[in-house]
Amino acid sequence: MRARYRACILSLLVPLALQGQDIGLLRLNPETGGRGKADVYGGYEAGGYHPAFAPASLWKAGASAQGTRHGERTSFTGSFSFEQIDGKEQFTSMFLEPGYFPVDVLEFTPGDKTRQTYKLGGGFATTFAEEFVFGVKADYTAANYAKRKDIRHTTYGMDLQVEPTVAVVGDNGVGLSAAYIFRKRTETIDAEQVGAATDQSYFAFLDKGMRYGTYQVWDGDGIHLDEAGVGVFPVKEFTHGFSYLVEAPMFAGGMSLLWKHGSVGEKGYDWFRYPGFSWKVFLEGRFKGGHSLRLDLNLQNDQLEESVLDKVTAGGITTPTVYAWNAVSDRNWGSLDLTYAVRFLNGPLKLLRAVLHGGLWDEKSYLMYPYEDQTTRYNGMATLVAAFGFGPVDLNLRVNGGAGAWKDQGLSGGSDAVDSVPFRLTPDWLRKMEYFSTTKAGAGLTLTYHLPFVRGLYVQAEGTWLHGFGIDLLPGADRWSSTVKVGYDF
């Protein structure tokens, strides 16, 4: 049991370099037979220090299972998980992951929201010609996100990623792999109003970047939630790219380069489109005495364009026609992480890890010519993790702290010939910036007890706390969570 725990701890030192691309290296020193785990959990989270889209409080429950089996020449891996989250007093973004897409749709009536997420993963790697390995890994996520208070909405999401990989595995523990990456991600917002329409109709906001956009009745033409001929707000995104990974006993390194193209709309009603790219690279050195040092660099970009679209009617048939595309916003962001870790094979202290994180964002809005605006923001965070083992009890302690800053250029480029300025949802933007930039400190504790009478069975309790300093606009200065889990390693 302790050896198994130690193996789990040591795996923390070598996190997956590039999501999914480890499949080709399954054949690098494979264990005999294989291993797996399964767990169920439940938790609660509350507190006022949270982004506007997050709930005031939530309950969650879930289950997961994963396993890996090794044969003489082929290895298989698979996983499944389900999670349900019930949030209270939740509003603003209707998307599953606010901020991921360059557009957003916001509503303003707090209510209960339910999110269900299903994840499936699987893959295989097989050896041929002694040192060569071919593998394929696929990860699929399906989710739905529903609110049952006007304006009601159900958001459906699908995310599929497939990575065929070719690797070379040497007898000296060195592995090289290259993978092609394909990803398709879609989300569809289906909104409706059940209650009777009144003079106080429900409004929504279509964010086209930096909280500049359109604010009107939710089913108006400018929001696109209930456009004739479409009826929903669909987003689809395709990503292609490649990645490389080098794995050795004392060194690891990798790189991925991805290009994406997304669009908003369907059936000829193409309201927006956005190209983008991401570049990730990491380097890790492993030294004597269990020490390791890792550097992660991540750069991303996307550019949002809005169509000049008209509905042309001929012979009683209406056809949407796109005449041109106008740039309305672009985003550039990056992060740099430096991780130092050391493992201990003797004594109660098993792992010590320190992470320094820095992030930089640059956003521009060109929603209404000749105006433009720009925001630059950056943040830094330091995290310290210590893992202990005391017989059947494992203890994980985490502390972190950080701060950020931002600068808004303000609208520029106007002239006397322009009477109006682009609309901005300023209060929500300021709350977003306050959550991002405030000085914060947090802590976490995870306690795991391995039951002695059933090998592999454990019970785990976890608690976290986060505090923001100098809060002015957010509902509170603290956020806390607790989770209880029962699991089995096999």
Give short role names for the model-derived ranges.
Residues Q21-Y118, G123-F132, A167-V174, S292-R294:
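Membrane-proximal, glycine/serine-rich, low-complexity loop/turn segments characteristic
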Residues L26-L28, G48-P55, E89-F95, A146-H153, ...:
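Outer-membrane beta-barrel translocator domains and adjoining extracellular loop/strand segments
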Residues G42-G48, F82-D86, Y140-N144, Y180-T186, ...:
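Transmembrane beta-strands of outer-membrane beta-barrel pores
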Residues H70-E72, T127-E131, V169-D171, T239, ...:
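Outer-membrane beta-barrel channels and translocator barrels
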Residues T92-D104, Y180-F233, W259-G268, K311-T318:
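Short, flexible helix-coil linker/hinge segments at the edges of structured domains or between repeats
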Residues Y215-L356:
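Long, internal scaffold/assembly segments composed of regular secondary structure
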Residues D478-F490:
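Outer-membrane beta-barrel "beta-signal"
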